[in-house]
Amino acid sequence: MFSFVQRFQNVSNQAFSMGIVMVVFIMASSYYQLINNNAFSVPSNIDNVKTLINVRTSRYFGSQRGKAKENMKIKFDLNTDLTPLFNWNTKQVFVYLTAEYNSTEKITSEVTFWDKIIKSKDDAVIDVNDLRSKYSIWDIEDGKFEGKDLVFKLHWNVQPWVGLLTYGETVGNYTLTVENKNKV
């Protein structure tokens, strides 16, 4: 007959194997639900973006050796419905607004202006006007934003209870050319 240790090992191996199978099933079914809900083609409307540029000499705002740097914040309108990102395995959704721009000839920079954690499906509809960005950004290369084209996009990250993180971005973006007159 089998000893107690062999029986315990047999039962624990069975439980572990079944646990792995359940986790894989949960991951696959929740990803399938995201595809079924068209989560990868959620529309967003980013509008009315206004830049607020300050010149700062503090090292907390990117200045080095007392040389002034332009710091930019924005005001924007955002309208999107992120309810397709929620299913039974969604713990929370992390949403963030980014801007891409060419800092030098061959380098594209991407910076984050705003983010939010959405914990329930009830809060998944975002409709805000004249919202001020959470973060102030500066360009590391030359420190000037004027004349640069910024392409704003809304990204999301689904954080599940079980499984891998799922990343994506909404459909719709906003392009803005920074002008010199917006300095504060």
From Swiss-Prot:
Further facts: Present with 6840 molecules/cell in log phase SD medium.
Family the entry assigns: Belongs to the SPCS3 family.
Lumenal side: 36-184
Glycosylation sites: N102, N173
Tagged with keyword Membrane: yes
Main location class: endoplasmic reticulum
Keywords: Endoplasmic reticulum, Glycoprotein, Membrane, Signal-anchor, Transmembrane, Transmembrane helix
Subunit record text: Component of the signal peptidase complex (SPC) composed of a catalytic subunit SEC11 and three accessory subunits SPC1, SPC2 and SPC3. The complex induces a local thinning of the ER membrane which is used to measure the length of the signal peptide (SP) h-region of protein substrates. This ensures the selectivity of the complex towards h-regions shorter than 18-20 amino acids. Interacts with SEC11. SPC associates with the translocon complex.
Highest classification ranks of the organism: Eukaryota, Fungi, Dikarya, Ascomycota, Saccharomycotina
Membrane topology: Single-pass type II membrane protein
The keyword Transmembrane appears for this protein: yes
Cytoplasmic side: 1-14
TM segment ranges: 15-35
Cell location: Endoplasmic reticulum membrane
Protein name: Signal peptidase complex subunit 3
BP GO annotations: protein targeting to ER; signal peptide processing
InterPro entries per the UniProt record, alphabetical: SPC3
Main function: Essential component of the signal peptidase complex (SPC) which catalyzes the cleavage of N-terminal signal sequences from nascent proteins as they are translocated into the lumen of the endoplasmic reticulum. Essential for the SPC catalytic activity, possibly by stabilizing and positioning the active center of the complex close to the lumenal surface. Essential for viability.
Native species: Saccharomyces cerevisiae (strain ATCC 204508 / S288c) (Baker's yeast)
GO cellular component, one term: signal peptidase complex
